[in-house]
């Protein structure tokens, strides 16, 4: 997939996981975005569910680039809407 900053990201499935001692969100393998991407959301949301929980993420995501050139997906907690596992 070509990374285009500012591009709309369609619906995909993501999961919570541990990285550097923190709970993070990432797309699962085989989705429309690489699993190496991280999804920016509130810490309260990420920590509300067991690690390994899967979610269906609806339309409304956009690719952004941080000051350190990291590409990530910005998400509102209301867009991450359905737990499908755990």
Where do the language-model regions lie?
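Structural detector for short beta-strands of small beta-barrel domains
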Residues: 1-20
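Short, surface-exposed loop motifs enriched in S/T, G, D/E and P with embedded aromatic residues
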Residues: 14, 39, 57-59
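Short, basic/aromatic beta-hairpin or loop at an interaction surface
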Residues: 21-36
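Short glycine-rich, polar/acidic loop-and-turn segments at beta strand-coil junctions
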Residues: 29, 43, 59-63
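Beta-strand/loop nucleic-acid-binding surfaces
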Residues: 32-48
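Flexible glycine-rich surface loops and low-complexity tracts that mediate binding to linear polymers
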Residues: 52-67
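Short peripheral tails and domain-boundary helices/loops at the edges of structured domains
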Residues: 70-86
């Amino acid at each position: 997939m070509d990374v285009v900053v500012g591009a709309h990201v369609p619906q995909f499935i993501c999961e919570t996981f541990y990285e550097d001692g923190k709970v993070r969100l990432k797309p699962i393998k085989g989705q429309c975005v690489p699993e190496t991407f991280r999804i920016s959301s509130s810490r309260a949301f990420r920590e509300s569910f067991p690690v390994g929980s899967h979610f269906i993420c609806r339309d409304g995501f956009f690719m952004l680039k941080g000051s350190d050139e990291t590409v990530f997906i910005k998400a509102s907690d209301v867009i991450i809407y359905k737990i499908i596992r755990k």
